[in-house]
Amino acid sequence: MLGLISGPIAGAILFLQDDNQQLIFVEGPSVSIVTEKIDFELKEEIVIKIINSGTVPLTFNDASYGLRITGLDGVLYYTPMAAQVVSELEPKDEITFVWDQQKLDGSYSLEGRYKITTEGFDPENNKVKKSVVINVLK
C-alpha cells in the first residue's frame, strides 16, 4: 500500500523539479546560478543571479563574482567588466547580472549552448564553483 501512495508522490515531485536550475540551500559552502529559463532567443537579455546557497560567507576575487560565460568548448565569450576589489556574498545574499548576449569582441552570440560559471572561495580558501548550461535559439 505504501508503494502505491509514495510512487505517484515521488513522480509528482520529480515532474516539478527542473534539473538544470534547482536552488537548494545547504549547510556549509555553496553557490548557485539561477536564470529565469534555460532557452533564450538570439539577443534576448539573460538575467543571471549568483546566490550564496550555503551557510558561510563566500569571497570572490573581483566585482564580477567570478562570472564567466563560455562555449561548451571553453572559449570565453563574456565576463563582466569589474573592479579588482575583493567581493563577498553572505549566506542567502545574491547578486544579479544581465547579459545582452554581446561577446567580448562586441559581436553577438550565435545560436548554441553556453556555460555560465561562477567561482569563489569559502572562509578556509577552498574553491566553491557552480555552472549551468543555457541554450540560445534562433
Task: Label each region the model flagged.
Residues 42-46:
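Structural beta-strand segments of beta-rich domains
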Residues 18-40:
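Low-complexity, acidic Ser/Thr/Pro/Gly-rich terminal tails and inter-domain linkers that flank the onset
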Residues 1-13:
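Hydrophobic membrane-insertion alpha-helices, especially the h-region
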Residues 55-94:
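The feature marks short-to-medium sequence segments in extracytoplasmic or secretory-pathway proteins
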Residues 35-36, 83-89, 104-106, 123:
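Beta-strand-rich interaction surfaces with strong enrichment in secreted/lumenal proteins
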Residues 96-102:
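Exposed aromatic-hydrophobic patches
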